[in-house]
């Protein structure tokens, strides 16, 4: 048996359909070219290869259809859906043409507050480290001293340390600290990393699904309940105003069950009238409001498909 029929047969065993075996892939960026600083990031060539695997080995469904078929128990074998988080401009500029060439559908979960010239805090950190003309970065105000940036490895280590240090800080404190990092770097930070409203409309006009991802991408578990609910509702309302269509799906920011969102947030998603929601937990699950997502990191097409199959062999974590 050749690799492709073997892979399809294996996937049919672990993803038999009905109410089991939906693979949901999650992407963030699709770069036009490989990034020398972060070579593991997905670029157009790698994304195209992964789409070929998806088209050949899976039954790729729009996520709303996949949810409806999970609910009715009619999911086909080897079912999969493709999603993107945050709202990067390259989703429309780079990923959309590749999806359309292959007749594939994706859902784009957009954090509405960063559209039209905004930049997420983590990207400010990444670009400050990437573009600084300096060989060191003084981060004594964070309690981590001076970071050495003379090599790509040093820059990668600095980014990892800074993101880990800042991730769970209160939103306003984090914004102030990130601004200090940007100033200390002396870098000219890029604009245009995130989509414009026109690009969101372009995705919608192309038949892609637009999903809510809050306004400011906060970690919901750190917010008072009314603020968390407001982030969910306002993000949805902003996207509906942009597209003129209904926003039916939600993605929890950061998305780790029990850490980044809690059972109360699942209840909020239901109460707000969403049809379903997705997490970043790995594994298999069929709770329509806590659907896990996973994207293999393998460059080999066969290994990519096999790792997706393996991911479906154990249950995903849930907030409750």
What are these regions (language model features)?
Residues 1-83, 90, 120-139, 205, ...:
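C-terminal active-site subregion of NodB/CE4 polysaccharide deacetylases
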Residues 15-19, 117-206:
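Extended, charge-rich helix/loop segments that form flexible
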Residues 25, 75-76, 88, 93-109, ...:
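CE4/NodB-like, metal-dependent polysaccharide N-deacetylase domain
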Residues 103-116, 150-164, 258-264, 286-302:
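Short secondary-structure transition/capping segments
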Residues 115, 216-218:
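Short, catalytically relevant binding-site loops at active-site mouths
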Residues 50, 95, 196-199, 265:
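Residues within well-ordered alpha-helices
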Residues 82-130:
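Gly/lys/ser-thr-rich phosphate-binding loops in alpha/beta enzymes
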């Amino acid at each position: 048996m050749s690799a492709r029929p073997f892979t399809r047969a294996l996937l049919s065993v672990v993803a038999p359909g009905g109410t089991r075996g939906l693979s949901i892939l999650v992407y963030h960026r699709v770069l036009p070219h490989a990034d020398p600083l972060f070579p593991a990031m997905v670029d157009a060539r790698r994304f195209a290869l992964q789409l070929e695997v998806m088209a050949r080995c899976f039954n790729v469904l729009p996520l709303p259809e996949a949810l409806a078929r999970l609910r009715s128990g009619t999911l086909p074998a080897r079912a999969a859906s493709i999603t993107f988080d945050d709202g990067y401009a390259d989703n429309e500029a780079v990923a959309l043409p590749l999806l359309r060439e292959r007749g594939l559908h994706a859902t784009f979960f957009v954090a509405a507050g960063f559209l039209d010239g905004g930049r997420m805090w983590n990207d400010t950190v990444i670009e400050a480290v990437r573009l600084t003309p300096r060989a060191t970065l003084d981060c004594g105000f964070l309690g981590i001293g001076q970071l050495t940036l003379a090599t790509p490895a040093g820059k990668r280590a600095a980014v990892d340390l800074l993101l880990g240090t800042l991730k769970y800080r209160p939103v306003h404190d984090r914004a102030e600290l990130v601004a200090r990092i940007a100033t200390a770097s002396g870098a000219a930070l890029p604009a245009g990393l995130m989509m414009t409203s026109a690009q969101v409309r372009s995705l919608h006009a192309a038949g892609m699904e637009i999903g809510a991802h809050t306004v400011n991408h906060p970690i919901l578990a750190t917010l008072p309940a009314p603020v968390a609910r407001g982030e969910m509702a306002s993000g949805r309302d902003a996207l509906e105003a942009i597209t003129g269509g209904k926003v039916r799906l939600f993605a929890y920011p950061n998305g780790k069950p029990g850490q980044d969102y809690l059972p109360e947030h699942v209840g909020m998603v239901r109460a707000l009238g969403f049809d379903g929601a997705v997490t970043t937990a790995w594994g298999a699950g069929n709770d329509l409001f806590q659907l896990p997502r996973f994207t293999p990191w393998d460059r080999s097409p066969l290994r990519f498909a096999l790792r997706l199959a393996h991911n479906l062999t154990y249950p995903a974590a849930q907030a409750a």
